[in-house]
């Protein structure tokens, strides 16, 4: 195989070749989120297929969803702290929305620390607080999306 053809194949598999930039290692957090999302989707499919699967995998799905939410909280916390400075061309509301997401992610992390993974389902008060945090995060993310589309 000649080098040009090999380059084309590698670009198709791994993305465009950028000689000036150093290739970064795949982001472990993003990969973990992707894997947890795929696992949850597979478990949901199995649960839908039969009652026996629902009985067998219901707890596993709850734990998988909890891990995915914890990873998302960590991701929003990291990305929000990375984007704490205003960049040229960023609409003014985006930064405050990012700060809100960071605060919500921190609160969500504290919730996960207080409720261990094995203590599912959560205590009613913790579950209510967690649901409120989820709604607040979703509305902040929706506002951020709306601002970024303007």
Please describe what each predicted stretch is:
Residues 1-150:
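Non-heme di-metal
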């Amino acid at each position: 195989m000649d080098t040009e053809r090999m380059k084309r194949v590698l670009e198709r598999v791994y993305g465009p070749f950028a000689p000036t930039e150093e290739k970064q290692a795949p982001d472990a957090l993003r990969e973990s989120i992707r894997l947890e999302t795929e696992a949850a989707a597979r478990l949901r499919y199995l649960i839908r297929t039969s009652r026996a699967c629902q009985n067998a995998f219901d707890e596993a799905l709850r734990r998988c969803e909890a891990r995915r939410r914890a990873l998302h909280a960590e991701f929003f916390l990291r990305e929000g702290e990375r984007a704490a400075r205003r960049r040229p061309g960023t609409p003014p509301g985006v930064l405050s929305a990012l700060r809100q997401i960071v605060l919500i992610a921190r609160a969500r992390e504290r919730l996960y620390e207080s409720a261990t993974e094995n203590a599912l389902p959560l205590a009613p008060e913790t579950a209510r607080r967690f649901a409120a945090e989820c709604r607040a995060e979703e509305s902040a993310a929706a506002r951020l999306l709306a601002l970024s589309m303007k």
